[in-house]
Amino acid sequence: MNFKIPQFPDFEISITAFENVTNSESIRSKVATLPYAFLDARMIYSQEQLYAALYRVLVEQNYNKLRTKTIHSEIMLCLSPTSNIGDAFKKFGIKEDSSTVICLHIKDRSDEPELPSLSSIVEGQEISLSKEFINQHRDIGMVGHVYKINGEMIENSTEDQVSSMIVNMIQLRGL
């Protein structure tokens, strides 16, 4: 899935999902050298959560406020409800046991035109990122724990309400 956000026409965003990934450990060992953000799909509750983090990254990039070394590592920090960079990488980044992965790339006009192909990096089945994919692979317990949304709140809320809680935490962190 490739798209642009109207407020940031100089950036093109690419999101690719993989399942049945068999080389997570290998990807994790070289993640710092790759021009992608590799997320553990279990930690993504909704597409809105991803979009909120991406929007925040682009705002911070626009105002030169990135706190990490790259725009791709900033994605993980922006997903986090806290400002701890290491904690964000541990919770949202690819893990050694990740079998479902979401790969993001933010390209601006200064990027090199040729990127390493994701199919040469990820050993797994590429599939379309959809609501169904996210619903199938998310771990509500892990997501609830990270965002401090208890099981009762999740059970008594609609899916959209839980997604809104997460998006609000992403947007309000640090204010």
UniProtKB/Swiss-Prot annotation:
Signal peptide bounds: none
A GO MF term: tRNA binding
Cellular component terms (Gene Ontology): chromosome, telomeric region; cytosol; EKC/KEOPS complex; nucleus
InterPro entries: CGI121/TPRKB (IPR013926), CGI121/TPRKB_sf (IPR036504)
Keyword Transcription regulation: yes
Keywords: Activator, Chromosome, Nucleus, Telomere, Transcription, Transcription regulation, tRNA processing
Keyword S-adenosyl-L-methionine: no
GO biological process: positive regulation of transcription by RNA polymerase II; telomere maintenance via recombination; tRNA threonylcarbamoyladenosine modification
Source organism, top-level taxon: Eukaryota
Localization per record: Nucleus; Chromosome, Telomere
Main location per the UniProt record: nucleus
Recorded family membership: Belongs to the CGI121/TPRKB family.
UniProt function note: Component of the EKC/KEOPS complex that is required for the formation of a threonylcarbamoyl group on adenosine at position 37 (t(6)A37) in tRNAs that read codons beginning with adenine. The complex is probably involved in the transfer of the threonylcarbamoyl moiety of threonylcarbamoyl-AMP (TC-AMP) to the N6 group of A37. CGI121 acts as an allosteric effector that regulates the t(6)A activity of the complex. The EKC/KEOPS complex also promotes both telomere uncapping and telomere elongation. The complex is required for efficient recruitment of transcriptional coactivators.
Description of how the protein assembles with itself and partners: Component of the EKC/KEOPS complex composed of at least BUD32, CGI121, GON7, KAE1 and PCC1; the whole complex dimerizes.
Name of the molecule in the record: EKC/KEOPS complex subunit CGI121
Source species of the chain: Candida glabrata (strain ATCC 2001 / BCRC 20586 / JCM 3761 / NBRC 0622 / NRRL Y-65 / CBS 138)
Lineage, top ranks: Eukaryota, Fungi, Dikarya, Ascomycota, Saccharomycotina
Annotated gene: CGI121
